[in-house]
Amino acid sequence: MMKMELRLLVSLIFILCSISMLAAEENLEHDQINLMTYIVHVKKSENVASHQSEDLHSWYHSFLPQTFPHKERMVFSYRKVASGFAVKLTPEEAKSLQEKGEIVSARPERTLELHTTHTPTFLGLKQGQGLWSDDNLGKGVIIGIIDTGIFPLHPSFNDEGMPPPPAKWKGHCEFTGGQVCNNKLIGARNLVKSAIQEPPFENFFHGTHTAAEAAGRFIEDASVFGNAKGVAAGMAPNAHLAIYKVCNDKIGCTESAILAAMDIAIEDGVDVLSLSLGLGSLPFFEDPIAIGAFAATQNGVFVSCSAANSGPGYSTLSNEAPWILTVGASTIDRKIVASAKLGNGEEYEGETLFQPKDFSQQLLPLVYPGSFGYGNQTQNQSLCLPGSLKNIDLSGKVVLCDVGNVSSIVKGQEVLNSGGIAMILANSEALGFSTFAIAHVLPAVEVSYAAGLTIKSYIKSTYNPTATLIFKGTIIGDSLAPSVVYFSSRGPSQESPGILKPDIIGPGVNILAAWAVSVDNKIPAFDIVSGTSMSCPHLSGIAALIKSSHPDWSPAAIKSAIMTTANTLNLGGIPILDQRLFPADIFATGAGHVNPVKANDPGLVYDIEPEDYVPYLCGLGYSDKEIEVIVQWKVKCSNVKSIPEAQLNYPSFSILLGSDSQYYTRTLTNVGFANSTYKVELEVPLALGMSVNPSEITFTEVNEKVSFSVEFIPQIKENRRNHTFGQGSLTWVSDRHAVRIPISVIFK
């Protein structure tokens, strides 16, 4: 009897232990499911600020429980870009951590979005001259590309004739075997955390393209499907490249990886950082790129970022911090042209990358599927969405499809599946006259919104409408270039409307550069892509050229040089236009279109030291703790004379004007000739008066600084009727230089 009771007791204990273990495992699994990566900012301690990375790592670990699985949960420890770390926590653990006095903040990380031959000539860069002379071409400068990795074997990254990297370079290469890294591609790191850590090979194709745009070598006979044929080169062909992979196709681009990449890049010794990604408008103390870029600026590193592809609406920007160069996108004067010719003889030009040589010029039946549907199906058919055309006989016909909802490639496949033999893509009103060279799956052309309306009217009013496509190949010399493309994000900045953004526009439409996989069965592979992702590395490369010429210039001085020398007219000599062919406003263009040749010799610059941003940040109303997250030193705004945004020594003015006058100062640094005199020229915004004192300034030595003041005086309110903002400029003119800054005024 006792033995039986003992067996029952043992069995009961075993069952209870098993239940307990199962419950523990279930809780563990539940915790694992609830784990999220948190970005943790810690109050900076002077005792550990100068410690080695290992000591810093141990200090960060001290904030976590002793029983905590540090090795499995700690993601990154930051040294340069932040006082803090990234760690996997449950919400409960994060809440407990935030209760510690030394913790400034702990918040879940977010995922950032990517902003996705002829351009050097278009920008005035010529081999053997100026910035492209043999002793420049970006020589000695290191550009860090924070992106999706790279295809390192592309000839755009060969190192023939290149010297070793500068002695300051501390980075390393995670590619193994052979000569993958070289004197061109000097470093490559993968910051994407995964179960199996892999080398930083490209998996989106984005990073290879952006790296080549910034600093690709000269490659002859580059083209895509035989189009845009010529010598491909980045902006700074002799600059060194360091690659930091932060994105993959499974988890996107995490902010913990981006902060880690910026942290490592600064430590490695890069001179320029290029980031073609962003998060939208955020407080700067929550924006990983703004935080990392401030640390970069403190260390003399220039940071260039894409403005985003969320235009053409106002206040759609990413990367708004004033210590970042925010880059919008413009067209170039090269187009890959085709036209839609109608049965009435009218012809409407557009673009396509697919240029068949043998397409018949015979007029074919032309249909608009949106004419056949009912209710919601009408819109689906007008957009040529997948499956929407299966009940329509399109055999042997040219099909008109509206742009939108799905890619043009998908629309083309639907047309093909339904028997269509050619496609005309009609832009939406938002796209206007912006067209793109795309490798369609059938003969096709994208035409403007206005052309699309006319073609629809022709179809509706004609008994048997007909059309054909005429393919014209690559045409150079569009007098309307540069123009602002529809997708380029616009200002004003949401987070800091007193700083004009974007800063600049640069080439971002139909850009040919290196690609990881051939799209036309030709090796080496190139592709043509559009986006502010493309305009950003153009400016990164141009910054590298300027840095090579002027190694002692600060990031703010380089930015000023780029902005104050920008073009405001297109090749036809009229103001730069937008996608509607209306004059582009200041919130689309910023200072204007980059002119690298002039930027190398600006005459004067508006310089800013890192500490100058603290009064500005206090003026934004940020708390001391929030500012400390950005600047990484102790701040007390009560002891700082805060300034309004427009008082920052920025190479533009953006003011919100009511009924009272506003008064600001700026300081100029002479980087031109020692003895020079400048006089002010004003383009005064609508309904405004302006006074500049002094109106003439004289310099007697290089690096001399002179200040001036500007008063903005509101005029009669009736003059503002039907206007929400005005724009103008202030230019200091000498016999050799014109140093222009744009002015935006929002009326309240």
From Swiss-Prot:
Its main location: secreted. Induction: Accumulates in mycorrhizal roots upon colonization by the arbuscular mycorrhiza (AM) fungus Glomus versiforme. GO terms for molecular function: serine-type endopeptidase activity. Keywords: Apoplast, Glycoprotein, Hydrolase, Protease, Secreted, Serine protease, Signal. Residues 1-24 form the signal peptide. The gene is SBT. Required for arbuscular mycorrhiza (AM) development during AM symbiosis with AM fungi (e.g. Glomeromycota intraradices). One of its GO terms (biological process) is response to symbiotic fungus. This is Subtilisin-like protease.
